[in-house]
Amino acid sequence: MMSNVANASQRQENPYIIPLPPSSTVETSTEPPRTLWMGDLDPSFDEATIEEIWSKLDKKVIVKLIRAKKNLLIPCSSTSSSNNNTSEENAENQQSASNSTDQLDNSQMININGISFIDPSTTQLHHAGYCFVEFETQKDAKFALSLNATPLPNFYSPTTNSQTNPTFKRTFRLNWASGATLQSSIPSTPEFSLFVGDLSPTATEADLLSLFQTRFKSVKTVRVMTDPLTGSSRCFGFVRFGDEDERRRALIEMSGKWFQGRALRVAYATPRNNMMLQLQEQQQQQQQLQQQHQQLDQEDNNGPLLIKTANNLIQNNSNMLPLNALHNAPPMHLNEGGISNMRVNDSLPSNTYNTDPTNTTVFVGGLVPKTTEFQLRSLFKPFGPILNVRIPNGKNCGFVKFEKRIDAEASIQGLQGFIVGGSPIRLSWGRPSSSNAKTNSTIMGASQYMSSNGLRAPSAASSVDNSKQILEQYAEDKRRLFLHQQQQQQQQQQQDGNFSMEQMAHNNYYNYNNYDYHRNKNGSHSDLVNLQRSNVPYMQEDGALYPHQYSSPSYSLHPTGNQFSNATNNLPQFGNAMSISMQLPNGNSNKTASSMNTNPNTNMIMNSNMNMNMNVNPVPYGMGNGANMYDVSRMMTPPLNIAPNSNNSKSSIMNKHPNRNNVPPIHPSLLH
């Protein structure tokens, strides 16, 4: 306790460490603010334990613990990994059932795509990770704020039957609450929020609040998002303003601001209490834009009959999920651009598009001008098969048509408010097309489809509430899979490296393939490894390259006579760069595939029609391993001639690179 008091006295020397109460709280309350928000609570803490913590510091408090919401998925893999760093730490955490997931058996955990989560249906969650603490005086509350980032007292709690802080790694995380006391009413005033990213791992709410309060007086609250179990910072948060002009000014002034050794990244965010207004404005904008949105197919006169038949099938099959009830499922709002399970309202705005069980089209609003259809497809792809993506010219919106209704539902809930290009996107139902009514996938039960995707299949739905819970869980599972895939891609890109075009050109991949291969059988192994590491795609500031950015030269050759061999020797020798196809001129019908044997990484097939295909693996960056030669040729300028191989084709398979599947593609501009 003495160490905590000493740390507090040191912190009080700096006036910016202890922030002032929010101006809105002071103006709307007759009592001085003395209530704090307290976060990063151990999952086993209860009111009595928290009161005892403050009692150890000679402070009498009243605690209001916020209970956890049902069906909240809490990851336990992060805690497990952190607890396995040292055997001593792991042994200490065994004393607290909440600090380690090693004590959970398989029945208490859910495994989704290699990530373990606590099963809320079998494990009791005591609270949502935070509470509100009311002190006797404002002076006591300010003293408590001075304890930010200091370790919690460690003692044996009889109510939890464990130590409160055995590792001394759980620290105080405190900030002013919106209400002056626990009984004070919180006025519903407009809030204007900013997303703040690239925070230091040690930055607290009080630090961030102090930083913004010195420049903007209307700052109301600050939140730094943390891991629900370990309490470690996720290095981003949100700042709420009471004045929109100050938020606009903060966006300009605080972007790139140096804070605790890092440059801040700032963007607009949407606060929770503004979502209803946002949804109304979005609905009006959607109706205007959908007048310009052409249907992919013409209306089918048999559509209503098929819908009626689908509903009858659902009613007659207890294992089917009533899709006509899913439109009442609440949207999963990403609070202020972040990730959360908080509900904004009980249902989406009711309209004909929303209630149509055959509709699989999602309207995407709030796109930045540079967003491409490929980016939009990549964003929504983890939620299920996509039939079509369209961004109207000159409009900051788009439409994503899914194959299945439940995937569209999941994407609306899972990506609502997701930050894309620094701006949160707005999602709702778009105008349906008749092709939605022509597929049987719209009447597929949710439990059946979830199982086919490797997700944990829920029990059959028997009520609307159960349908909401199933959809929320399904959307959350897909969203976590999406974020996990993004993280894996970023880690892979970091491992591969991020070399500039000049560095790649300096590696001279052409000379290596064309000369060293014939000279020394691919050179040494170390040279090959260095080549693989250096030959990586060029990454722009806004991410990877996309198909429309490939401006490939024409590979159509028209040599005559003996010039054929020389011409083919001048083909781009960037094995594994891309797949091309060429139509041989009639005057060279006697040439064989062996005359083009210049690239050890190339497979070449010549059929009886003298159409020659040269395939190089893998395909260009951004197309994925599943793309074929036709996919690649379509995006070239001009399109290349593709001739399918016939049964009587004669082929010559050329030598393969020993590690051809591991060599990443190069930037297409080097092919010019």
Swiss-Prot record:
Gene that this polypeptide is encoded by: NGR1
Misc remark: Present with 1540 molecules/cell in log phase SD medium.
Recorded superkingdom: Eukaryota
Gene Ontology MF term list: mRNA binding
Name the UniProt record assigns to this protein: Negative growth regulatory protein NGR1
Domain RRM: 36-159, 192-271, 360-432
Transmembrane segments annotated in the record for this chain: none
InterPro entries per UniProt: Nucleotide-bd_a/b_plait_sf, RBD_domain_sf, RBM42_RBP45_47-like, RRM_dom
Comp. bias intervals (Polar residues): 1-13, 23-32
Modified residues (Phosphoserine): S524
Keywords assigned: Acetylation, Phosphoprotein, Repeat, RNA-binding
